[in-house]
Amino acid sequence: MALSAAHCDTWSESIVGALPGTTWHHRSFTEEIYCRACGLVLDWAGAILTPHARQLIADAIIMKGLPRIESDFKRMEYIRHMNQGIVFSSGRILGALSLLPLYPRYASLIDEAERDLHEMIANYVHDDGGTLEGMAYWSYTFSSVMPIVWALARYRGQTPAAYATDTLCKTGAYGLGMLSTVGDGTHYLAVNDAHLGGHYPPGLCAAYAGLSGDRRWLALYRSAMKAGEGVPDIYPV
C-alpha cells in the first residue's frame, strides 16, 4: 500500500487541487491519511523494506503530504478552532516522527506540531470538558488523537497516562457523561451530528481506560468487542 501510494503523482483531494493555475485546495484530508499510513509503515515495517523502498516512502511523505498539511496550518486559522486541525495533526505528527531515523532535523517540526496539537485541543474543549460538535464528531476527533498521544509519549519517554493533559482527560469524562441511559447504556446521546445507536469505537474506549483508569471505559470496550463492533484499527496491533 505505502509503495503504491508513494508512486502516485499527488496526494491531493482531487485533480483540481493539483491543476496548474488553480489556487483551490480541499484541505489536507487525503494528505493526512497517507502521511499517517505511510508513517506507520516506516515505523512498524521499515526494517523489512529495502533502503530504496524506505526512501521512496519518506520522499512521498516529505514532498506530497507534509507540504499541503503545513500550508493548512500556516494559512487556515479556522482549523485551529474545530476538529480539522486536530485530525490533521495525526498525519502531520506520525509522518514527521517516522522521518527521524533518516532526517533528525524533523524534530523541530514535531515540536511545533506538538504545541499546535495541545493548543487546538484546548481550543476545542470547553471548561466543562464538552465540545460544540456532537458525539460522533467527538468520537472521531479523539480517536484520531489517541494514536498521536501514544506516539508522542513514546517519543518523550513517558507513559501515555503521564503524557496526557488535564484537558484530554476532562473531555473523556464528558464522553462518559454523554452516554444514554436507555438500553444497555453503551450508546451515546443522539445530539447535534450524532444518530441513534451510535457508540464509541473500541480503540477509543481502550485508550481512555488506560489514561483514566475508569473501569467504565473498560466495560464499554469489552461490550463493543463482544458485540462484534470492533473495526480494524491500530490498537490491536
Model regions and ranges:
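Carbohydrate-active enzyme catalytic cores, enriched for enzymes
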Residues: 99, 137-237
